[in-house]
Amino acid sequence: MAGKYTPRSNSRTILFLFLIAFSLILFLFLFLFSVSPLRNSAPSHSLPHFQLRNVETSFVTSLEHFLANANSHSPTPPDQQNDIGKLDDAVYHSEMDRLFSDPYYPLSLPLRVYVYDMPPKFTYDLLWLFKNTYADTSNLTSNGSPVHRLITQHSIDYWLWADLIAPQSDRLLSSVVRVHRQHQADLFYVPFFTTISFFLMDKQPCKALYREALKWITDQPAWKRSGGRDHILPVHHPWSFKSVRRYVKNAIWLLPDMDSTGNWYKPGQVFLEKDLILPYVPNVDLCDARCLSETNPKRDTLLFFRGRLKRNAGGKIRSKLVVELREADGVIIEEGTAGEGGKEAAQIGMRKSRFCLSPAGDTPSSARLFDAIVSGCIPVIISDELELPFEGILDYRKIALFVSSDDAVKPGWLLKYLKDMRPAHIKEMQQNLAKYSRHFLYSSPAQPLGPEDLVWKMMAGKVVNIKLHTRRSQRVVQGSRNGCTCECKVSNITNTASVIS
């Protein structure tokens, strides 16, 4: 009878409702499992690419935020270690404590870095000078490049300093920690903006400021104790600090390359065992995961180059390459500078190309290499004297082709070399570029495995040698052979045959 209640019908209803509820729970579980990061917990090295979120990579935008919050940056508390002897004793006790308490000392991370609290005329005043004059696009270098964009691509001093002095709660790097007592430090960071002062100050006031900075730095007890060997000095543009840097040649220089021709650095001033190569700040935007998936199948230009076609010193190879390649099918060679229009043209060209030409300029390096990497365009490096950033960590053979200058200018050789490249090899290198891009993007906050992080991982390998030379200099007696004769300076000549496979 309709509507009549029976125990059997009630049990069927309960069973039906149970099955529906169970199905909903099972569906929800499977959905959550499918989106869980644990489901595809592949090792990070197998990930095809990465994406930046809530990170600022623009120097201008990051600087505006930095200066707007300048009062929140914690200054270095005064460390009253004005007596070199007392500082040396304090360092000894600190190092002995670490030796017996840390089984990995002195190779362990994080590195302990003391950041000097220099007078504002060496730091904040120069940053404000850049910000207040940035809109003046008429300020050009002798070759027509906008000065402020040139400063931007050498702004490694800003990115490192901004991260070091940020509140610890805002920092993401575990490779370095800031200490506020000099005797606790492995290294000392000198936050003087040498490139901004060189390009934005008149010649004589700039030289005067360099002399003041030199005196301030070399008067520090920690500098006198080590002769500057454990001090980090950012001189990323080859002209910066040039008039006085012979007096600080023992310090660790942060450089764009190591020109061995003598045009930029004097013999004995720079070498790999002492100094560190840092990448330029890219001039173009990152081609992220979505961009790469859209552009890689459509890269129909074989080889692309946009830049100055005539350069001095090692860059003379450019004019020879123009003669060889300019009319070739599938090749785009354009004259251009790094202005806003130039940035857009270079970015579009690189994202349409499989290979990007990266020849030497006035110096062995240029920002173009890093523009190509973040654009997903395989660099073709023709710069026989080039030294590369973080090469103790990164294997550039996986993302770039190295061609000797002699081979590159042989009629037809370079085009045949590129056209004979197997599609599978090209695809593999493009995938590797997607993984490597993160290592060349300066950002705020600084990211793990970004260039700021790799700086300190590379520095960790120098600490033992720095301590060796510091202690050796402290105990060498007068009249002894006080010059080290164990420098290893192997010539750096590109051998195309060794990298074809």
List where the protein language model places each region.
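Catalytic binding pocket for nucleotide-activated donors in carbohydrate/polymer assembly enzymes
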Residues: A345-L441
